[in-house]
Amino acid sequence: MTKRIITISREFGSGGRFIGEEVAKKLGISYYDKDIIGQIAEQSGFAPEYIRENAELSPKKGLFAYAFSGRDITGKSVEDMVYEAQRNVILKIAEKESCVIIGRNADFILKDREDVLNVFIHGDMPKKVQRICKLYNVAEADAAKMITETDKRRRTNYNFYTDQKWGMAKNYTLSLNSSQLGYERCGEIIMECVK
């Protein structure tokens, strides 16, 4: 297999992280998800805990609050500095090796590369709620709230930094419904596309 980069954007609870990890294992390529946080922290100078809480989900207080957030002398906000560090780390990883990258707007950051397969994993709300209840041991109402809030923050971040619409099929090579296809079949389809 020639070098391939697979980016997986996903709705919370759709199993995108699990699917990506399985694809990476089966293809024998690197997998980048939360472990990328250390590299982003090093590049940005912010603590890993701050990156973990804010990188993928900022601007977390909305665009109005973002407009009034602190800035450095170049006019960049803290969120912008974290995003720039994240972008640089993703570009370096893509240059280095075949891999699966979960989230972090990697699909947009790498969109001009010919060796990239951009995937969006989504699912039906009842199945996502069921998965989150099981993973986090929470009630259905709490799971639904977690899904709605996490996806809203991901959407805000993506739409702000990319000028594209998060989850819109035309922004991805593949858009797969894990509730209808199942996690295993989603993984098989992704692997068929990179052969």
What are these model-predicted stretches?
Residues 112-134, 140-148:
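Conserved phosphate-donor/acceptor-positioning beta-strand/loop module used by diverse small-molecule
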Residues 8-21:
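Glycine-rich phosphate-binding P-loop
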Residues 87, 183-191:
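Short, amphipathic alpha-helical "lid/cap" segments that border enzyme active or binding sites
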Residues 2-11, 97:
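Pre-Walker A (Motif I) flank of P-loop NTPase domains
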Residues 30-41:
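Short beta-strand-centered segment that lines the nucleotide-binding/catalytic pocket of NTP-utilizing
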Residues 93, 109-112:
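RNA pseudouridine synthases
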Residues 59-66, 139-184:
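Small-molecule kinase domains that catalyze NTP-dependent phosphoryl transfer to phosphate-bearing small molecules
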Residues 41-98:
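ATP-dependent small-molecule kinase phosphotransfer cores
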